[in-house]
Amino acid sequence: MKLSVGIFFGGLFAALGVLLFLVAFGTDYWLLATEIGRCSKAPEDAGTEKATFHHEGFFWRCWFSGNVREHNTSMWKFWYTNQSPSKNCTHAYLSPFPHIRDEHNSTSYDSAVIYRGFWTVLMLLGVITIVMASFLIICAAPFASHILYKAGGGFYILAGVLFSLVVVMYVIWVQAMADLENYTNMKKMDCPDFAVYVRYGWSFMLAPIGVFFALLAGMLFLLVGRAIYLNSD
């Protein structure tokens, strides 16, 4: 009875972990940024403060325009139904936010691409590992194999560790690697009242929750494998 309960909750936590990892991996809301500034001198733009909204993930970086007095800068502005009907997108790997013009030959750009490369590799390894863990657990269930349960549990723990590194690296990226101060100063040459507001998006927030469920599932499956091994003697 206790073994069945452990398998049930292990499977439940594993399913939640896989779902959260895949959603975080596949959606483009790890970073949300709002640029505000009155730069245009056109008469029709007089008295209005324009805003550009950016959201970025593993695959894409997208942006769309809006009006500050019509929309606030909260996270809800980036929800699907609140976005502009048309927006521009580019690959996030070679053009991460903030994208400074004429920087492709600079050392900072090269460092950013290399850092994003490591982050990308860890993200892919985490997704592959958790899919392999799920496959091992599915194979273990019909045969009650303690080896497969232990292997699956180990892979879930490894996936949790990899995604923990992904989260930590992204925090370091936003806080240190992304040259927001230089980007803001460059923009202020054209727009003296320019300001940029950056926050973590809901895709980023799902990743630590997925890490928790993956680690919990991994430990449960290790205990299940040990219990099956002891009962088989």
From Swiss-Prot:
Domain of life, source organism: Eukaryota
- Does the record's keyword annotation contain Transmembrane helix? yes
The segments annotated as topological domain Cytoplasmic are 139-153, 225-233
User: What topology does the record note for this protein and the membrane?
Assistant: Multi-pass membrane protein
Cell compartment(s), UniProt: Cell membrane
Q: Which cellular component, as a GO term, is one annotated location? A: plasma membrane
Q: Which UniProt keywords apply?
A: Cell membrane, Glycoprotein, Membrane, Myogenesis, Signal, Transmembrane, Transmembrane helix
Gene3D superfamilies reported for this sequence: 1.20.140.150
Renumbered residue ranges of the record's region Interaction with ITGB1: 52-62
Up-regulation conditions = Up-regulated during myoblast differentiation.
Q: Which first-to-last residue range defines the signal peptide?
A: 1-26
Fetch the InterPro entries from UniProt: PMP22/EMP/MP20/Claudin, TMEM182
Q: A Pfam family for this UniProt protein?
A: Claudin_2
Q: Which GO terms describe its biological process?
A: muscle organ development; myotube cell development involved in skeletal muscle regeneration; myotube differentiation involved in skeletal muscle regeneration; negative regulation of myoblast differentiation; negative regulation of myoblast fusion
* Tissue expression profile of the protein: Expressed in skeletal muscle and adipose tissue.
Q: Which residues cross the membrane?
A: 118-138, 154-174, 204-224
Q: Hey, which stretches end up on the Extracellular side?
A: 27-117, 175-203
Q: Which sites carry carbohydrate?
A: 88, 105
Q: Which family does it belong to?
A: Belongs to the TMEM182 family.
What assembly does the database describe for this protein? Interacts with ITGB1.
Task: Please give the function described in this protein's UniProt entry.
Answer: Negatively regulates myogenesis and skeletal muscle regeneration via its association with ITGB1. Modulates ITGB1 activation by decreasing ITGB1-LAMB1 interaction and inhibiting ITGB1-mediated intracellular signaling during myogenesis.
Name-wise, this protein is Transmembrane protein 182
Source taxonomy lineage?
Answer: Eukaryota, Metazoa, Chordata, Craniata, Vertebrata
Gene, per the UniProt record:
TMEM182
